[in-house]
Amino acid sequence: MCIRDRGEAGTIVLAGVSAQTTWEIIEKAPWVSAPGGPRLVMVPATRHSDLRRWLWEHGFALAADRPVQAAGRWYAVMAAEYTGEVRTPTFTECLFGRTAEWPEGAGYAAWQKAKLPRFRLGVPDGTELAEEIDKLLDGSPSQTR
């Protein structure tokens, strides 16, 4: 990013790269992680859950998190702002974010849930994560709170 002065950009768009590349870009621009910094609009190509976790664990709040389906794939369009409030989200919060707030949320949730059986194979039985995933797979209420 080529921004010379703080406040020069009110909104920054990061799209079409992985979640990890997105947060690495944010880390290289520390002025983004400051109160009053710009709003970030992100469309990660992969690992939506990981980006949500990173944002929350680094003091960002999701202002919006809208699921969009394009070319047979689901994407999450996220808007985040730095608040400084660090939080540790659950796996379920990271998986769905705030997507349930939108009409497309049910389709996105079904897509995310469809990936869980394979993911669950790599999670040791008896762990908190395993229990959380098992609840989601058993059809317990998940992100429709």
Short names for language-model regions:
Residues 1-5:
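Conserved small/polar residues in nucleotide/adenosyl-binding loops
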Residues 8-14, 20-145:
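Class I S-adenosyl-L-methionine
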